[in-house]
A protein has these predicted regions:
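A short helix-coil junction within the Rossmann-fold of NAD(P)-dependent oxidoreductases
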Residues: 68-70, 120-129, 175
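C-terminal helical subdomain
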Residues: 179, 183, 191, 198-238
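Conserved active-site helix of classical SDR/Rossmann-fold NAD(P)-dependent CH-OH oxidoreductases
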Residues: 115, 159-170, 207-214
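Hydrophobic structural elements of the Rossmann-like NAD(P)H-binding subdomain
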Residues: 78, 134, 181-184, 194
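N-terminal Rossmann NAD(P)H-binding glycine-rich loop of SDR-like oxidoreductase domains
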Residues: 9-25
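Rossmann-fold cofactor-recognition segment
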Residues: 37-57
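Catalytic loop of short-chain dehydrogenase/reductase
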Residues: 83-87, 91-107, 127-175
């Protein structure tokens, strides 16, 4: 098996750090880069999701032969960015709880930021070889699967993230026909995001979720469009 390079965006969160460990522990992975807003001992770059200039700077550094990692061409790019509670405000349960500031922040973090990551990091995928770009979505981002209501901003932002991925994937697949593009539902995972809503014993360990998501991703075939699946590899309706 040939060696490969992997990039994790949002590598400081529970799921992002588990993805990074997964790649670091794979002997076939010659380079595992984790980017986040937090400084760490093993990364030379950091970005701010809501600052496009910093995203562009990181992407440029990764495709620069004189950069900290040399010229990178990634087989795997995982976007693990996102948040449910933003600025100490949790999801809205009722229509009367909506306010423009909170809605805009949800879209900024869970849709606009991820879209700009696609813009700047899609070009770093391998060109004429099998590759994968996956972004963390959520089952609540499915319009068809919405039977419970609530969580207005988070649902809407994740649905927007899905649409942005689908549209970008169709364009990107014209140059990268062997690439898989996926919106991933990681399940309910032990993390700061889920801690207020579910007991730890009822949630997946991050490493277990990542192991299953990687298994699901390896079984997806290029279709020229994005695919929406859960951690078990089951298709989720858009």
């Amino acid at each position: 098996m040939r060696t490969y390079q992997a990039l994790v965006l949002g590598a400081s969160g529970a799921i992002g750090s588990a993805f990074l460990r997964h790649f670091e522990n794979d002997s076939h992975c010659s380079l595992a880069v984790g980017l986040s807003r937090q400084k760490s001992s093993h990364t030379h770059l950091q970005f701010e999701l809501e600052n496009e200039e910093s995203l562009a700077h990181c992407a440029a550094a990764l495709c620069n032969p004189s950069g900290p990692y040399g010229l990178c061409e990634f087989k795997w790019i995982i976007d693990a960015t996102g948040a449910l509670t933003i600025d100490n405000l949790g999801p809205e349960k009722r229509l009367e709880a909506l306010n423009s500031k909170q809605l805009l922040r949800q879209f900024e973090v869970n849709a606009v930021g991820p879209a700009l990551l696609m813009k700047h990091f899609f070009p770093l995928l391998l060109l004429q070889e099998n590759a994968c770009y996956a972004t963390l979505s959520a089952r609540v981002g499915s319009i068809e699967d919405n039977y419970k209501g609530g969580w207005y901003g988070y649902r809407a932002a994740k649905a927007a993230r899905n649409m942005l991925l689908q549209t970008a994937a169709i364009e990107a697949a014209r140059k990268r026909p062997l690439s898989v593009f996926a919106a991933l539902q990681p399940g309910t995972v032990q993390s700061n995001l889920s801690a207020k809503f579910v007991a730890a014993q009822d949630a997946l360990r991050p490493e277990d979720s990542v192991s299953q998501m990687m298994n699901a991703l390896t079984h997806l075939k290029p279709t020229g469009r994005a695919q929406f699946v859960d951690y078990a590899g089951c298709e989720i309706p858009w």
